[in-house]
Amino acid sequence: MFELKDVTRRFGKKLAVDAVTLTIPQGQMVGIIGRSGAGKSTLLRMINRLQEPSSGSIHFAGVEVSGLRGRALRNWQRDCAMIFQQFNLVPRLDVLTNVMLGRLNHRSTLLSLLNIFTREERVHAIAALERLGIEQTALQPAGTLSGGQQQRVAIARALMQNPKMVLADEPIASLDPLNAKIVMDALRDINEREGITVVTNLHTLDTARNYCERIVGMAGGRVVFDGKPSDLTAEAVKEIYGTDKDGAGIDETMTSTSIDIAPERADNQSAGIQPLALAGL
């Protein structure tokens, strides 16, 4: 069980997140929607403790996450994997190494500094890449990949952490519709197959409806909607996104990312190369 209790964040006089209280059962997939500046990203960064709450508390499995320090905090950031819109990869390092960096908080400092990884870690990393259909990129510099491929590498890196919770901050904001679907399919697969809680910030209403069993709407730093996709009425959407200058509500087709694609794509295959051979194993 994950809980936020009256979590607030101020930046000077600006109230970015205003007394948010949420309870999320283990294994739920939650989409947080709202306009830019609604407080979505700040909320996720506080959950991961990349930013500190000004007040309120955060709890996971009975532990007050907002009070953790030192090694306990590093362990939480390992257990609560974060996926960013900007991917946060090391462009000059190959894809395989970027994925294995997800093991940093599981390893000794010396091994991490020397980038020495075990055979088991390499096998695990290749399996994560294979699961996301990009094992053929294992030895390429991460900076040479497309945006969609880089986001899948970031998801593979998150899997390497063996997380209990995954936070995805606008994971498809910079992607085309095809890659957006691939990334969202991957997040849903993680949620359904491992039973890992996934909380993702999204701009697009159709994506939230199609992938998330629960939707949280934010406006002005506050939660103004919390319910099932079927409960997200036109009035609720208007409260979340506001109206245009004529007072009309938002047209959901303006945020659509819908696209129909086959489950498997030929360019995701590794042309017969065995996955372990890609890692020199």
From Swiss-Prot:
InterPro entries according to UniProt: AAA+_ATPase, ABC_transporter-like_ATP-bd, ABC_transporter-like_CS, ABC_transpr_PhnC, MetN_ABC_transporter-like, P-loop_NTPase
Pfam family membership, one:
ABC_tran
| Listed GO CC annotations | plasma membrane
Matches recorded under SMART domains: AAA
Q: Where does ATP bind?
A: 34-41
**Reaction equation(s) it catalyzes:** phosphonate(out) + ATP + H2O = phosphonate(in) + ADP + phosphate + H(+)
EC number from the UniProt entry: 7.3.2.2
Where is this gene product found?
Cell inner membrane
EC supergroup of this enzyme: translocase
> Domain named ABC transporter: which ranges?
2-245
- A GO molecular-function term, please? ATP binding
Q: Where is the signal peptide?
A: none
The topology of this chain with respect to the membrane is:
Peripheral membrane protein
**Principal subcellular localisation of the protein:** membrane
Q: What does this protein do?
A: Part of the ABC transporter complex PhnCDE involved in phosphonates import. Responsible for energy coupling to the transport system.
Q: Which NCBIfam families does the entry link to? A: ABC_phnC (TIGR02315)
Q: How does it assemble?
A: The complex is composed of two ATP-binding proteins (PhnC), two transmembrane proteins (PhnE) and a solute-binding protein (PhnD).
Quote the protein name from its UniProt record: Phosphonates import ATP-binding protein PhnC
The organism is Rhizobium etli (strain ATCC 51251 / DSM 11541 / JCM 21823 / NBRC 15573 / CFN 42)
